[in-house]
């Protein structure tokens, strides 16, 4: 009888057990993004596009995706008539008016937003 009471005292309550098991399974919540925040954007080349010397940039969270397109065009020294295709995580092609901070909230990985770029249609 004493042994049963001892075992009962050592057993954690169901809420404690649930907390421990769910903590390991839940993804880490993203950092709160404000309009003044800067986001780490990581550019990955694909489809024969030249790689950038500097692949990571800190960009304001409140800018449109068009600003990112313009920045990348400048880095690649592309003419206005040359095609450039950008995808988030190789899957999603945002519209130019999307806000970078919102894209980060939805698609960031390891505290950075990965943007794949190509001079030809590579995904989609």
Swiss-Prot record:
Region (Disordered), start-end ranges: 1-31
Gene3D superfamilies recorded: Phosphatidylinositol 3-kinase Catalytic Subunit, Chain A, domain 1
Segments of skewed composition (Low complexity): 13-28
Pfam families xref list: APG12 (PF04110)
Database matches in CDD domains: Ubl_ATG12 (cd01612)
One Gene Ontology cellular component: autophagosome membrane
GO molecular function annotations of the record: protein tag activity
UniProt-recorded name of the protein: Ubiquitin-like protein atg12
Organism: Dictyostelium discoideum (Social amoeba)
